[in-house]
Amino acid sequence: MIPSTWFRRLIFGLFILEVAGALMWLAAWLVPNPADKAFAQTVAGMVFLLGFYSGAPLSARFLAPRESDDQAMRNRLVRVLRELPRSRPVFLYDHDEKNANTVGILASQSRVYVTTGLMAHVSDEGLKGILAHEDTHVVEHHILVTFSYACAYVLVANEVNSNHLFIFGFIAFMTLRRYLEYRADAGAAKLVGKEAMVTGLKELNAIYPSKSWARWFMTVMAYPPLPMRIKALETGRKVLF
């Protein structure tokens, strides 16, 4: 029996919390001087972030362990990839969840994961846009950018103990994430054409319709609502707040 995705995510989340807690405890235990404990835990936090981002390919394999053996779907994926001027290694996983994502802190270790559930609900044109979007994340080092921001935030938080800093840092991080999504959409449009990327976004919006209230909560969202991403491609106007 293979556990469901939600169960694997629960186990993985608990494991991550245990590792983070263990690193913080170890840092505090190794440094006897109370004045140096905060800095030691800051270093431990950065080590944790490095391990978390670097180990993302392994975590993706844990969350989606079954590589698809559907030959027709694999052939279709290969055919679409051949239409892309460039692409990362793409792995097709047998799962009903409709998803595609990129993991790996460095371009050399990055992997793109696509589920059979997504492929069954998008056209070849839409799939081409989605894959180009994920490839742009790799080429422009978006995961490395978010990792660098997280490290910078940890360092600043060590120097400035403020609730306002926490709130500002969180909002800034979410804004950065939304900006990088717009960048990936624009990069995909340059790579395979605007129509392919718009098609991909429209098909994703059909799968996951955006709620009417999402616009008002965008400040704390990691992804802009899909209609806004489509409009940004069509007009060139990116709305971050």
Language-model region placement:
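Short pre-active-site segment immediately N-terminal to the catalytic Zn-binding motif
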Residues: 113-129
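Short, Lys/Arg-enriched, Gly/Pro-containing loop segments at transmembrane-helix junctions
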Residues: 66-69, 184-190
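Short, membrane-interfacial amphipathic segments enriched in basic
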Residues: 124-128, 142, 220
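Catalytic Zn2+-binding segment of zinc metalloproteases
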Residues: 135-151, 195
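Active-site recognition of the HExxH zinc-binding catalytic motif
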Residues: 114, 129-142, 184-185
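Active-site-proximal gating segments in proteases and membrane effectors
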Residues: 82-111, 174, 188-241
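Hydrophobic or amphipathic, alpha-helical segments that drive membrane association/targeting
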Residues: 1-95, 140-141, 153-163, 167-179, ...
